[in-house]
Amino acid sequence: MTEHWENLNALTAPLLTWYDLNGRTLPWRSVVTPYRTWVSEIMLQQTRVSAVIPYFERFMAELPDAAALATVPEERLLKLWEGLGYYSRARNLQKAAKVIVSDFGGELPRKCAALKTLPGIGDYTAAAIASINFGEPVAAVDGNLLRVAARVSGCADDIMDARVRKQFTAHLNDAIDLARPGAYNKAMMDLGATVCLPNGAPKCEICPARMMCEAYKNGLTEVLPVRAKKKARKIEERTVLLLFQNGKAALRKRADTGLLASLWEFPSVLGNLDEAGVSLALAQMGLSAKSIEPAGSAKHIFTHIEWDMKGYFADVTGENDDLFWADAAAFDAAAIPTAFKKFAALVRARLQ
């Protein structure tokens, strides 16, 4: 199928007309600053808009600028981020904030190239900040824009291929409205998020690109965009130990690197253990169980791995230097990953 890149240029004017009437009302758009755009875009990576809104508002209330973000204790930062997942995003935000304060006078740099020198800011985020806040005509190319562009142009190449993404970026940069680059990027984001939907369910009847869209004209909306299949996730069985001693619950700090780095978790062991296995695992930790009872099961899906978890409550005696015994206040202050959300609620209900 022949690509029709000129369709992207033809889309620009009707797209902006559509956006002026249908653009989403979002908290980071009601009050627009480079800092707010930056934080919102980082939060929106891998996370739905509806889920981000309350986190964004809470974050802004406590950390309204780069100076506040640069100096907040990491434990508090991770607690504010709790539930959003991908905690390296929060750590990179703080690393970048420290550079912004030390090297840029507390204000984000105005150019895309300079923004990309900051930790955690890649091509897409830099383009979003630079276009929305400073009027730089650069396309913020993410999955939404690639999907729209692939369908409108009829490009059947793999959008996950770096060379193909570079080609799309060049054509989108050519199509961007020079007078309203920020509005163009937001319009494409909104079109992809609300109309040109993934998984074969686009709302073509209300799409401003309908008359120039190759996928619509050729019945290919369920085929485009083309993307290589992801590798199957590894499934890992884990037994989660919800331990209590003297009215406190056991937490353990994860390693400083890797998955869920530096966050608090419940002790766990690989495998699907029964009560006898739990008793043995506790003995290997230097603990003895006075009682053991099932605490249900939970599942959590990461990008490349899936945890199938079974939990047990246990009242224990003994000591283990890797464990921190948290009362209710300390438990509430700890940053515990969403992976353990179900178990955290069960533990919290038992703490006085």
Residues of each region from the PLM?
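Intrinsically disordered, low-complexity, charged terminal extensions of DNA damage-control enzymes
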Residues: 1-25, 30, 193-352
